[in-house]
A protein has these predicted regions:
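N-terminal secretory signal peptides and thylakoid transit peptides that target proteins
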Residues: 1-14
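Beta-alpha junction/loop-to-helix N-cap segments that form part of ligand/metal-binding clefts
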Residues: 28, 47-48, 63-132, 198-205, ...
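Solvent-exposed, acidic/polar segments of extracytosolic/periplasmic ligand-binding ectodomains
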Residues: 29, 338-391
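Extracytoplasmic "Venus flytrap"
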Residues: 32-52, 74-80, 167-175, 227, ...
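Signal peptide-proximal N-terminal region
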Residues: 50-71, 187-189
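Extracellular/periplasmic Venus flytrap/periplasmic-binding protein
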Residues: 85, 128-130, 136-239, 276-287
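Periplasmic-binding protein-like
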Residues: 90, 94-103, 122-124, 165-168, ...
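Extracellular/periplasmic periplasmic-binding protein-like sensory domains
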Residues: 233-308, 319-321, 325, 368, ...
């Protein structure tokens, strides 16, 4: 009888140990982040995102709603197939509960996986309107190109540009930027005399620069990703197009804060529309920008603040769900969320799961020997005007 009682006690203790072990295991919350850390043109995206994610977790800790966060960041090189493989491994092998993804091609590649797995996924550096329509579990606290292009068209037309040329890369974000700009510019009574699309990989700008010179528009609306904008702007200036009176306008990518000083004084006076500048005048941003630069030796840009805001979205949603990572529960918590970001006030549109934020008109100016995107006009709480219907 005593032996039986002891055995029961041992069994009960073992069962309690198993339960405790399960509880301890359950308290760890795995977040898998797939971004480009290498690869021509996109490695800067990963660098900015990683710095912002690190800063947010340092400031807010790694325990949320009683669950210890375990972040895994993997490099997809900006390659869609690599991202698909990595995210599949994260879901199946690593048992991650929340996913973070970087640029447009990789986000589109993983959309079917995310929908099937029903994993809440924060999109950090995809500017294409279509992205959040590709999975009901995508949510974006980053940026969208269409509102920037739309606002840029409105501002350019109201400030004297009548005839413009558009020049973009032939991929989803470029086409969307072009479409938004053209739509709004024509609505405002302007004329788009030619729309030029060029290859995404290693484009030769020379013939396109000559074409712009021959057309002699009032302005050229330009959109290129990564480092291509800096190369184009430099060649534009070297070939004398700036002196011809043709203005360059574009979304914020054109004069990204991280690269601006390397672009040189030919960028002075260039006008862009974007959701964030490292020079944004608020106490929160001054602290944020100074800390990022101090810790990493580069300026934060719009990609950086997208990563920072994405982490805020995840942390606050987990607090609302008390640590529950069910995809539908997290998405419900994220929809309609609003907060003060280093970029200014932002929110998540409950219908589209997309960011709503201010779009600032900025001029490149030299202050204390450095080039900055100085904001001088604000369009508040701008939604994506070109948004396709959400799924």
């Amino acid at each position: 009888m005593l032996r039986r009682t002891l055995l029961k006690g041992v069994a009960a203790t073992a069962a309690m140990g198993v339960c405790a072990g399960r509880a301890a295991a359950q308290s760890v919350l795995k977040i898998g982040i797939c971004i480009p850390m290498t690869g021509a043109g996109f490695n800067a995206v990963g660098r900015q995102l990683q710095a912002a994610i690190k800063l947010y977790t340092q400031q807010h800790g790694d325990v949320v709603a009683g669950r210890k966060l375990e972040l895994t960041i993997r490099d997809d090189g900006g390659v869609a197939d690599a991202a698909h493989r990595i995210v599949q491994e994260m879901i199946v092998n690593d048992k991650v509960e929340i996913i973070g993804i970087g640029i447009t091609p990789t986000a589109l590649a993983i959309a079917p996986l995310i929908t099937e797995a029903k994993k809440a996924t924060f999109v950090m550096s995809s500017g294409a309107s279509i992205t959040t329509t590709k999975s009901p579990y995508f949510v974006r606290a980053g940026f969208i190109l269409s509102p920037q292009s739309w606002i840029m068209a409105e501002w350019a037309r109201k400030n004297g540009s009548k005839r413009v040329v558009t020049l973009v890369n032939d991929w989803a974000p470029g086409v969307e930027a072009e479409t938004a700009f053209k739509t709004r510019f024509v609505q405002q009574g302007g004329e788009v005399i030619e729309s030029i699309r060029i290859p995404l990989a290693n484009p030769d700008f020379a013939p396109f620069l000559q074409r712009i010179r021959d057309l002699n528009p009032d302005a050229a609306f330009i959109y290129f990703p990564g480092t291509q904008a800096a190369i184009f702007a430099k060649q534009f200036a070297e070939r004398g197009l700036a002196q011809s009176g043709i203005k360059i306008v574009g979304p914020g990518d054109l004069t990204t804060d991280d690269n601006l000083n390397d672009m040189g004084d030919q960028m002075l006076g260039m006008i862009t529309a974007g959701p964030y500048s490292a020079a944004h005048d608020s106490p929160l941003n001054k602290s944020y920008a100074a800390t990022i630069e101090k810790d990493n030796h580069f300026r934060p840009d719009f990609v950086s603040v997208s990563g920072y805001d994405s982490m805020h979205l995840v942390y606050e949603a987990l607090k609302k769900t008390n640590g529950n990572t069910d995809g539908d529960a997290l998405l419900a918590a994220m929809k309609g969320m609003a907060w003060e970001s280093p970029r200014g006030p932002i929110s998540i549109d409950p219908q589209t799961r997309d960011v709503v934020d201010n779009i600032y008109i900025r001029r490149v100016e030299k202050i204390n020997g450095q080039l900055w995107n100085t904001e001088f006009e604000t369009f508040t709480a701008v939604k994506d005007p070109m948004k396709p219907p959400a799924k």
